[in-house]
Every structure is written in structure tokens, then in C-alpha cells.
């Protein structure tokens, strides 16, 4: 208990020092909506928002109290078994978003980053405790890997986190925990993946097992990659299965998983290696489209399903920025400002969090009717993937350059810009 209290104190102190005047965030009290003049684009704002989203999940699981403390909100038509799987959703999706920060964030020397390093140290401790609690079959918070088909999805997101933090969420884990994690991932193998983006969850699990030094099944990776190459529909977009859907699943799942899987195991087969240039070029193009979809006020088109994933709609844009793979005409600082505006629009409206600090279903506040039957409280934590650029150091241009307008702001105020064009790759 004393160790846990020390970690909690370390995180709270780091927050209060890193962003003075924003210490209320550590108490999980959502502020009112910001005016345009109040919008912050700096790293401390992003850390504040990351903490508001992630800390309730990580803290509860590290104490083996996630099941007893996290609410389970779902739509009226929600599946009855969501209470069994929503906790894995919350943890895996949170971890997938903050993994690059856990791996690399705030590592540079200097007074500007000392508080962030302290914050990160505290987070690493509770994350490792949380992983241990979640993969131990004897734990009251065992995350029920393999219990339902939904656990295939979120074992995939857990795997994505492992791939994004090869040291902190793999090599530096206790050997017992690493073995239990591998067992947990393998427990999802009997589950059938649908012939759509779900194939990438199965493939991501195998890529993570490869990264963990475990036996892995190449056929699951090969099938997922080959099918998605067949499902490419042009101009940077893939179908979700044989058909194209007007939604954000190219960013929620498809392209981030393709990038991570090929980065992990792409060199294991010549056919996979040959896919990398096209997959990277398509990701860059789709990131370009996503940047243009962010309106001058930080809103964006509300189309397709899974809208309560909020800023997760821009996971690929965040991922491409993290990889320094943005198109030449998209400056990193304009992506920072655009994503900051999205964070303000989707995380600051009243009702986004309940009184205890847990996310509620909605896009701009609490809008439970936006939730499809497969969405529950845990699902909402895919919004954490907007925080991927926190894995870049403070000195990186993404963070250090002056604020800049993004494409929609430039165009709607009358700036002259080169017209947009499709790619044929």
C-alpha cells in the first residue's frame, strides 16, 4: 500500500508541476469547453489530457480493482456480455495509445522535461503492475482472454501496444509476466476473425508473439496482409473487407495495424517485405486526407460507425506524425495544432467524463445514442491513440516549432494553396 501511495503521489506531483494551473486534471474533473483564444497546443496540455483519460484505468487495474470500480455503460441494444470484456477493451486501448510515450517520452535532459520524466516513471510502475494483474489467471482482474470474440479485438490492441514499446512493454517485463502475457494472447487463437479488419487483430497477436520470442503462426499474418492488399480501393484507402465503408476504420484499425505488423515481421517473408513501400505510401496519403478533414474549429465529419471513439479517428495521422512520415506539404506543427483542436472538441465538453473520471459514450459530451451495440465504456478508450506523438521528444519539431494553421484553417481564411490530388499506388 505504501508503494502504491508513493506512485500516486509521484504522478500527482509531476502533473501539478508540469502544468501549473491545471492541477485539477489530476482529480479527474472535466473543465468547461475552451474558447478559441484559450486553446493550447503545447505538450503539457496533451499530457494533462492523456492523464485524465488513462489514469483511472491504469490505477484501478494496478490495484486489481478495475472490475469493481469501472462502470459499464452501453447502449440499450448492447450485448449482454460487455461486462465480461469491457475491462480488457479499456486497458488494451489505453495502452496502445500511450505506449510510445512510455517507451520514449520525456527522456531528454533538462529542467523542461524533468517533471515529465518523473511522471513517466510513475506511469511505468503502475502500467507494469496493471499488466501483471491483467494477465495473471488467478487475479480478480484477469482480463478474460479468449472468453468471447471481442477479446480477439482487444488482445490485438494489447499486441499493438507491445509492438509500439518493445523495451518497456516487452523486454523489461518480469519473465513470469511475459510468459503469462504470451499465454493470454494464445488463448484467443480459437476465436474466429471476421473477413474484415478483424484479420489484422489475429495477425497483430502473432506479430506480438514473435516480438516476445514465442512460436508464432505465419499463416495468420500472411492471410491478413494478402487480403488487405486485395481490399485496397485506391487513393490511400482500404475496404473493410471486400467493400469500402465511409467511416474511420482505416484509422481506427486498418492502417495502424498494417504499419506495426510490417514493421515487426515484414522482413520475415519476401512477399511481405515487398508490400512495405506501398503500405507506407498509402498511409502517408490517408494521413494527408485526415489532416484535411479537421475543420478550422477542430470538428470533423461525423460519418460511419464507432464515432464515440472520439480522437481515435485520427490515430493514423498521429501514427504517421510519430514516424516522421508526413507528406512534404504537411508540417508537423500544423498536425500538432490540428490534433490539439480535436482533443479540445472531443475531451473538454461537459459530460465527457462521469463524476468519477470515467469516459462516457459520446463525441462532444455524453451522447449515449451514438453507441452501437458493441460499444461500452471500455471501447471508448481508443481515443488514447490520438496521443501517439507524445512518443516524440520535446525537442522534436512536432513539439518545438511555433503554432501553425492546418489546411482547413488556411483555406477557409482565403490562403492560396496547391490543390489536392489522389495517388494511384
How should these model regions be labeled?
Residues 1-14:
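N-terminal secretory signal peptides and thylakoid transit peptides that target proteins
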Residues 23-25, 36:
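Boundary at the C-terminal end of the N-terminal hydrophobic targeting segment
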Residues 104-127:
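Beta-propeller domains
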Amino acid at each position: 500500500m505504501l508503494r502504491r501511495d508513493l506512485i500516486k503521489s509521484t504522478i500527482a506531483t509531476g502533473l501539478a508541476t508540469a502544468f501549473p494551473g491545471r492541477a485539477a486534471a489530476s482529480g479527474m474533473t472535466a473543465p468547461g469547453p475552451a474558447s478559441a483564444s484559450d486553446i493550447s497546443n503545447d505538450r503539457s496540455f496533451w499530457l494533462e489530457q492523456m492523464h485524465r483519460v488513462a489514469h483511472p484505468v491504469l490505477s484501478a487495474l494496478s490495484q486489481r480493482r478495475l472490475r469493481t470500480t469501472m462502470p459499464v455503460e452501453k447502449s440499450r441494444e448492447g450485448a449482454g456480455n460487455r461486462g465480461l470484456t469491457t475491462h480488457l477493451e479499456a486497458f488494451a486501448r489505453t495502452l496502445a495509445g500511450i505506449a510510445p510515450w512510455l517507451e520514449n517520452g520525456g527522456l531528454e535532459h533538462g529542467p523542461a522535461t524533468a517533471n515529465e520524466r518523473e511522471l513517466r516513471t510513475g506511469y511505468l510502475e503502475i502500467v507494469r503492475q496493471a499488466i501483471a494483474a491483467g494477465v495473471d489467471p488467478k487475479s480478480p482482474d484477469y482480463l478474460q482472454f479468449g472468453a468471447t470474440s471481442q477479446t480477439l479485438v482487444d488482445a490485438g490492441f494489447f499486441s499493438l501496444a507491445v509492438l509500439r514499446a518493445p523495451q518497456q512493454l516487452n523486454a523489461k517485463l518480469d519473465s513470469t509476466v511475459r510468459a503469462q502475457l504470451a499465454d493470454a494472447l494464445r488463448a484467443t487463437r480459437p476465436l474466429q476473425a471476421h473477413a474484415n479488419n478483424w484479420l489484422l487483430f489475429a495477425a497483430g497477436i502473432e506479430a506480438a508473439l514473435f516480438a516476445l520470442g514465442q512460436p508464432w503462426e505465419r499463416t495468420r499474418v500472411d492471410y491478413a496482409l494478402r487480403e488487405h492488399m486485395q481490399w485496397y480501393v485506391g487513393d490511400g484507402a482500404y475496404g473493410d473487407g471486400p467493400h469500402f465503408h465511409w467511416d474511420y476504420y482505416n484509422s481506427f484499425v486498418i492502417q495502424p495495424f498494417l504499419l506495426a505488423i510490417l514493421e515487426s515481421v515484414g522482413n520475415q517473408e519476401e512477399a511481405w517485405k515487398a508490400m512495405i513501400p506501398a503500405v507506407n505510401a498509402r498511409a502517408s496519403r490517408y494521413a494527408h486526407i485526415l489532416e484535411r478533414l479537421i475543420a478550422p474549429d477542430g470538428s470533423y465529419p461525423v460519418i460511419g460507425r464507432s464515432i464515440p471513439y472520439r480522437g481515435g479517428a485520427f490515430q493514423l495521422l498521429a501514427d504517421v506524425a510519430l514516424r516522421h512520415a508526413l507528406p512534404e506539404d504537411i508540417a508537423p506543427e500544423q498536425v500538432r495544432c490540428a490534433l490539439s483542436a480535436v482533443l479540445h472538441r472531443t475531451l473538454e465538453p461537459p459530460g465527457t467524463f462521469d463524476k468519477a473520471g470515467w469516459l462516457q459514450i459520446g463525441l462532444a459530451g455524453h451522447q449515449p445514442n451514438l453507441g452501437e451495440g458493441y460499444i461500452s465504456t471500455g471501447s471508448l478508450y481508443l481515443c488514447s491513440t490520438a496521443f501517439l506523438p507524445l512518443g516524440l521528444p520535446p525537442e522534436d519539431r512536432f513539439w518545438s516549432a511555433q503554432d501553425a494553421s492546418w489546411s482547413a484553417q488556411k483555406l477557409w481564411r482565403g490562403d492560396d494553396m496547391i490543390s489536392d490530388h489522389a495517388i494511384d499506388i
